[in-house]
Design a protein with these regions (language model features):
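Generic structural signal for well-ordered alpha-helical scaffold segments
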Residues: 198, 202-205, 222, 321-325
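Nucleotide donor/acceptor-binding cores
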Residues: 151, 230-232, 329-330
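N-terminal cysteine/histidine-rich coordination modules
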Residues: 2, 71, 82-88
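Extended interfacial segments that mediate partner engagement and assembly in macromolecular machines
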Residues: 78-81, 89-208, 228, 243
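Rossmann-like S-adenosyl-L-methionine
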Residues: 3-30, 35-38, 42-75, 244-370
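Short beta-strand elements
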Residues: 148-171, 223-225, 281-282, 287-293, ...
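Short edge beta-strands and adjacent turn/loop segments
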Residues: 215-228
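Short, aliphatic-rich beta-strand segments
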Residues: 158, 223, 230-239, 297-301
Length: 370
């Protein structure tokens, strides 16, 4: 049943009220903390004798000690064992991982309703409930938080002390790397492969790339994990083609996980933050990995576009296909098609219904058409 405008406004008001309550509590805590600090500072100011050089020297030493302690404390606070992810506060990735999944979906629903408010009012329609992973907003019961759904993982590399190779995520708002032992939203094993690449590069004295000095070799690594096939493809991005102990390095990377079917090397010697360069070559295994969506099998090359969350991709594609309302003889153009996933899935769906259509795929990157 379509939700009325009044009902939508009422629900949005409840959401805003709940969020406002949380902000108010946070504001009160912050104010209380500031008041306490202010009283403490006044007390210290009274205790200090005017004109005492000794007190000033001691205060300077104390500030220096506290400054060092604060830096150490700040580094420790970056790791929160109670969070779903121990490095969530410092990592530049997830921002809502510690919120209950139902609240995440509710926030998305409110955002979509606000975005399409004028259209819905003009056309007399409503935004459908958000369809999450394994649950639709409004369903009764629990909303289990999804984990391990990102089937593409990547890392930058940076030089550490004494030839160390550092990897992980960029700290929020910086280019400082935060080490990542594991990531709860990535496919199982993906982060272990990336960390293993850093260890093997360090063992074989392959230097990490320094983006400030533009020196070094190993820049990035990308791991793509199949959803239905359980195959894994690794792409190593280097500043130049030639590497010390290259073959040994490639074979060591391939041995990190028995699921790895392809190791590719991409050469990117250009300055800047773009991950991939124009040249890619296969250095181990097959030229492509394989995965399946909606019953269609796809060959995926190292530089081809492929959706990161296959489970939601199937849901998204099926919604789009159902909305196409295809008929016999229709021509379907899949623009910027990458591997052609949505177009080919639409053709297969039409064939199941006995409908014959023509598919045209348009893609600029030849490697995308595996």
């Amino acid at each position: 049943m379509a939700e009325s405008r009044a009902e939508r406004k009422a629900r949005r008001a409840l959401i805003e009220a709940a969020e406002g309550s949380e902000e108010k509590k946070s504001s009160k805590k912050s104010k209380s903390s500031q008041d306490a600090k202010g009283k403490s500072a006044k007390g210290k100011a009274k205790a200090k004798r005017p004109g005492s050089r000794r007190n000033e020297d001691k205060a300077s030493q104390t500030r220096s000690k506290h400054s060092h302690k604060d830096r150490v404390s700040s580094a420790r606070k970056a790791v929160d064992p109670k969070s779903p992810c121990s490095i969530m506060k410092s990592c530049g990735g997830c921002t809502a991982l510690n919120r209950p999944y139902k609240k995440q979906l509710t926030a998305k629903q409110a955002a979509m309703e606000e975005l399409f408010a004028s259209l819905c009012e003009r056309e007399g329609i409503a935004v459908d409930p958000i369809r999450g992973m394994g649950v639709t907003l409004g369903d009764p019961g629990k909303y289990p938080a999804p984990r391990g759904f990102r089937h593409k993982a990547a890392t930058p590399f940076a030089p550490g002390k004494e030839g160390a190779v550092r990897c992980g995520f960029f700290e929020r708002g910086t280019h400082k790397i935060v080490a990542v032992p594991e990531c709860p939203v990535e496919a199982p094993g993906a982060r272990q492969i990336l960390n293993g690449i850093a260890r093997e590069a360090e063992r074989l004295h392959i230097p990490a790339f320094n983006e400030d000095k533009h020196l070094g070799l190993l820049r990035y690594a990308v791991v793509r994990c199949g959803w239905r096939t359980d195959q894994v493809m690794v792409t190593l991005v280097t500043a130049q083609r030639d590497l010390p102990h290259a073959q040994e390095f490639f074979e060591a990377v391939a041995a990190l996980d028995p699921r790895i079917v392809t190791v590719a090397q991409n050469i990117n010697g250009r300055p800047g933050n773009a991950i991939l360069g124009e040249e890619t070559r296969i250095v181990y295994g097959a030229k492509c990995m394989r995965d399946q969506l909606l019953g269609c099998e796809f060959d995926i090359s190292p530089t081809a576009f492929y959706q990161t969350n296959p489970q939601q991709t199937e849901l998204l594609y099926q919604l789009a296909i159902d909305g196409m309302d295809l008929h016999q003889g229709d021509v379907l153009m899949d623009a910027y098609c990458g591997s052609g996933t949505i177009g080919l899935c639409a053709v297969k769906d039409a064939q199941k219904k006995g409908i014959g259509i023509m598919l045209l795929g348009v893609e600029r990157n030849p490697a995308g058409i595996a």
